[in-house]
Amino acid sequence: MKTTPNTIEDAHQSLLQSHGQGAPSGSGSPLQLTNCPWCGHEIKPGRDVKAETFSNGRARVFTFCGDALGACDFSAAKAPGEGLPIVTVDEEIYRRLPDLLIATVDKFAQLPWNGKTQMLFGQVTGECPRHGFRSPCMDDSDSHPASRFGHPAVKSIAHGPLRPPDLIIQDELHLISGPLGN
């Protein structure tokens, strides 16, 4: 399993590479699941993982169940705008602020050097309806025009501090076992 990408753009480039396009990228892969945890169908990077960059959408990576018939609740047919409720890209984790975060010590060690990590502990200043939470450490504008991909114009709203997530910090990710691990 590769490491996770730091940015949505890195994830997008990794997915292009999996399609045989784009330059080789050593920045990790947004595909961290091999099978849907709900139904067990295989997940393929070129087919079931999609990236929307800032310039063309919501700055999100979507992982869908690989069920070609669309019977799974997390397939592209049944959950076209969401997919599985997971985030695997650092930049998206800071903006979407999951309730449970599983990370290696290597990622946790970034805390003193990456100002965006303060968001993991609830230190936010606003929320963009399209891109998620904001902080002074993020390069982002307060508003975004309607996109050519169908997203409406949005303006950020002020938001106070949030409750921080529960953390599981593991030195070696492969040592995690049980329902969330191998």
Question: What are these model-derived regions, one by one?
Answer:
Residues M1-N182:
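N-terminal helicase ATP-binding lobe
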